[in-house]
Amino acid sequence: MKQVCILGNGQLGRMLRQAGEPLGIAVWPVGLDAEPEAVPFAQSIITAEIERWPETALTRELARHPAFVNRDVFPIIADRLTQKQLFDKLNLATAPWQLLASADEWPGVFDRLGELAIVKRRVGGYDGRGQWRLRATETAQLPDDCYGECIVEQGINFSGEVSLVGARGHDGSTVFYPLTHNLHQDGILRTSVAFPQANAAQQAQAEAMLGAILSELNYVGVMAMECFVTPAGLLINELAPRVHNSGHWTQNGASISQFELHLRAITGLPLPQPVINSPSVMVNLIGTDLNYDWLKLPLVHLHWYDKEVRPGRKVGHLNLNDADTDRLSATLEALVPLLPPEYASGITWAQSKLL
């Protein structure tokens, strides 16, 4: 039996473990503070569900492990500075940017990047945290500790957000899912919609960009690339060197889920192109109590993470997929009264994509 240890034991590790069971792969998600002797890592392949981690007895041990897949890639992608430098090195389209070294640079920043600046911490920060949207009169609100530790990007006037989830095998072969349309609110992914066939030009551009990144990094496994849709084409926003929230629809909408695909890639199993037969919608459950009435709707697949429910916390997701988009839209409509009011706008957005 193949064994995989996952650095991190959140919902991504949980879903990787679930995906491993039918394949006969024993998957062990482990907390960062676990005692090394309690973790069966000696004969395991090592992967991670997070981009960065503190130094602990376990992480020190795993950092030396010869089968830690992509070990040297995580630091590059975890730092937005080196991630942006990678895009520039490969001549890949991304928002104009620079390192923000001191407050003295602000006049030049707005001259170069325009009236809206997006400031992001180089490391950490996700789901909208550690980011600021600033105009020239608002720079005083940026914490002093950001200077030297943040990048600043041009605010992009985009018409939509999409992501590409793909995987690369040890032999260099790559496979990709269709582009996923994503709706973020307050920086948090709320809803995703995917179709068997994406826009051909966008799909080709996205695959070329992510393929170049995977090859340059000699990456193995699943990676996600988030992009802005603009009149000139796609601009890369950020990378995630792991399975990704916007790929959760693949659990019920693809012949091979992103979780199974990642395990196949890192363990050297066959990596065929996943087949997608019908449109899919994913609704993130954020700070919402479990409601089994969702399951009264026959298209709904519930994925509950068994986490304490807190405001702003991802605690599960709902997947829906059906070849009949009218039936899919009607099921979304039936979900509205079963969810808190803040879900209505995301469901309306998904329905508009299905038209």
Write out the residue ranges for each language-model feature.
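Short, flexible active-site loops
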Residues: 187-196, 238-251
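Short, low-complexity Ser/Thr-rich regulatory SLiMs
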Residues: 166-170, 227-231, 306
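Active-site "cap" helix and flanking loop/linker of ATP-utilizing ligase/carboxylase catalytic domains
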Residues: 204-225, 230, 241-288
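Active-site nucleotide/adenylate-binding loops and adjacent lid/helix of ATP-dependent enzymes
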Residues: 78-163, 167-213
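ATP-binding N-terminal substructure of ATP-dependent carboxylate-amine bond-forming enzymes
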Residues: 1-85, 104
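Peripheral (often C-terminal) accessory segments that flank ATP-dependent C-N-forming ligase machineries
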Residues: 264-355
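Conserved protein kinase catalytic/activation segment
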Residues: 233-235
